[in-house]
Amino acid sequence: MRGEVRVQARKPQRQSVRRARGSLTEDAIVETAFAIAAESSIEELSIPLVAKSLGVGVTSIYWHVRNRSELLDAMTDRALRRSGLPAFTESDDWRESLKAHARGVRRTFLSDPVLTDLILIRGALSPLARRLGEQETQKAIANMIDCGLDEQTAHDTYSAVSELVRGSILLARLVQKHNAVQRTESADEGGFTSAPVPPDDRAFELLLTSVLASVAP
């Protein structure tokens, strides 16, 4: 209408959280990536998602890590240092030493889903992870040979136990992911959610004992 003064309402502008110049570090990036992975999964982790969580531009992240693969390598190294993965302990009873090591490794991975995703599911090892793995393998095989096994039998036995441990962890992780999806869907539909099912140790122990008992001496 004539004489009316139209006042256009201004939309409130979204306030972006910006970090102070120079405050972004690789440590902050890696820790944020861990938080994202713990809430979702390694598969969903991306550089843009990390940048968004930190309130910075994607380009700022690339000043510290060149790509997603390098970020995952940095996470893997940090996860390994934090995990307390048990070292192989030599003894005169190689079966007990290998059994204790297998149980310890399995227990560590089962308690840390992000570590499992980074090392076992991702399939690409950082130089540190590869080096640590090779050291433990050589130590275990050397102990088995010292106890009377020939080199080929020692290698085959260690490989069999490693595959058993790896398979048990991966199966438990897949079940965990499947149950998480089911709980989410059930919650969205307003239904009841069941408690997570703990991994079955009995099958693992039976197979581990059988593998070790089949080896002479």
Where are these regions (language model features)?
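Hydrophobic alpha-helical connector segments
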Residues: 85-121, 125-126, 132-135
